[in-house]
Amino acid sequence: MAEANFHLGLQTMKVPMSLHAENRKRLVTELQSKAAGSIVLIQGGESETLHSTDRERLFRQESYFHWLFGVKEPDCYGAIDINTGKSILFVPKLPESYLVWMGKIHPCEHFKELYSVDEVHYTHQIASKLEKLKPKSLLTLHGLNTDSGNHTREAAFDGISEFTVNNEILFPIITELRVIKTAKEIDVIEYANKISSEAHKEIMTHIRPGMKEYQLESLFQHYVYARGGCRHVCYTCIAASGDNASTLHYGHAGAPNDKTIDDGDMCLFDMGGEYYCYTSDITCSFPANGVFTEQQKGIYEAVLKSNRAVMEACKPDVSWVDMHLLADRIQLEELKKLGILQGDVEEMMKVRLGALFMPHGLGHFLGLDVHDVGGYLGVERKKEDGLKSLRTTRNLKENMVLTIEPGIYFIEAIIRQALNDPTRACFIVQEAVEQYYGFGGVRIEDDIVITETGCRLLTDVPRTVEEIETHMAAGRNANEKVLL
């Protein structure tokens, strides 16, 4: 009998359900010495409607639940017996009306085979089925996501008050396991990177001055879904041109990628497709017309040098804070060479001048969430400018997956503030930096996995100035018609 898997046909990836069985086994191994006799109980994501209407949101599974069970349906629960490793899925018993509006109602056996779990029951049976197992306690998930500031949703069901509940043990253990990826998980993340990389290359091929930013966003979304089965993107697409590229999270509801792209604009496209809930996060920066000006080339190559230096230095036991500082130092050195800054770079580092041009952190964990969990397990957040925006301050470990995304941005209002601060103004060549007002910014974001001796690049897009110009020129020669 063939192994159960998730697969969307055509050229999309088959993901084996053994990925989740391996995750459950890892969790049981960690819990056996700490909570023998207990049962893990976790609640999946719920179906919901939009505001006060009956319009359903497009469902996306809760990440911890997906990590353990890989279930695509909403309103489910999962349990794992720590003593035996037995996996139990609880699915809702659907009303007969579901058959008319939503389709076939499957029996429990269907879900047992689909997700390769040991048992499947209905959610209204949770209390009775768990009571028969006589658990020492139920381990529920409760903890803080340090990226969002939100807590995980703790499982609840009718009858839970009859059980001893422990909500302290599970969160730090399962979160740390999510930080260190298995080979099967890395394969899916690499697939998401592959299809997203191709979509970014498609954008470089088809972009033309005069188009709207959202048209390129649309092209990306179409490509990753049509070619790769990525129904979801991992975050709101950033399709920024010109000065919009200096807004770190451009593309939101108040600025919905709606500018007309001008000839001469520098573009910054930060987009990632999501496959089977596993994410990618790639940023490409390039000139709208396919040819870098000297000004654009100087800033771009400064960021690329920073990106590649960090990539070369990443390996187990290296501090992520040190990687951020390395990126800062290189970019300050390059800005000095371009005549935008002056003075001693080490003195610039002391006043955190790098945060003026790169106010965000160097990168973040990547996995089932684009800003993946575990960044501040057992470590403290830094307080200095720039460093306080890091999403982790941990040392690197083998099989961590992270983004490397240095950037240089010319945010006029922030630069003008710095020019009024004597401790920073002394390093800024005012007449030079003013030539970059309206430039926007450059970010180069790649996804990597830490290996035994270094790191492996998962992203595959043109990166040097020559590669980008060659790729964009070839696209123009092969496709003279503008894609609308």
Set out the residue ranges of the language-model regions.
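Active-site neighborhoods and metal-handling regions in enzymes and metal-associated proteins
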Residues: M1-L484
